[in-house]
Amino acid sequence: MEIQTVDFNVWPKGEFNADYAQLFTGNSYLADVGGGVHNVTFEPGCRNNWHIHHKAVQVLICVSGRGWYQEWGKEAVELKPGVVIAIPAEVKHWHGAAKDSWLEHLSYHKDVQDGASNEWQEAVSDEEYNKLK
């Protein structure tokens, strides 16, 4: 079987993420693609605040562009197409686009327990973000 790659993204960009705008630096877009999965699109330089998913694992699947994922107290991990990150419950983290690239990742939660919630915290500082290359 021959595998072909394509140079376009099949996932919809979605609508401006107005409900969560105050929890992001920059603009993001959200598309519900079904089955509890969302495509999140970040403009260059956009990232979400530090946050914790209580009683749920979050899975990120990078589908286009380039960006970053970072857990509190650890080095940032580069996101690029094909990278999958499984974020354990109770881990403080953030994710977003690189300064010079859009980023799209699929996001869903698994192993969701009763009482699951998100705790949004402080913004990722410009100083911290600007260290990433």
Which functions belong to the PLM regions below?
Residues L30-D32, V37-T41, V59, A76, ...:
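Conserved hydrophobic/aromatic beta-strand scaffold that supports enzyme active sites
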Residues T25-N27, A56, S101-W102:
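Short acidic/glycine-enriched loop/turn segments that link adjacent beta-strands
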Residues R47, H54-P81, V91:
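A short beta-strand-loop-beta hairpin characteristic of the jelly-roll/cupin
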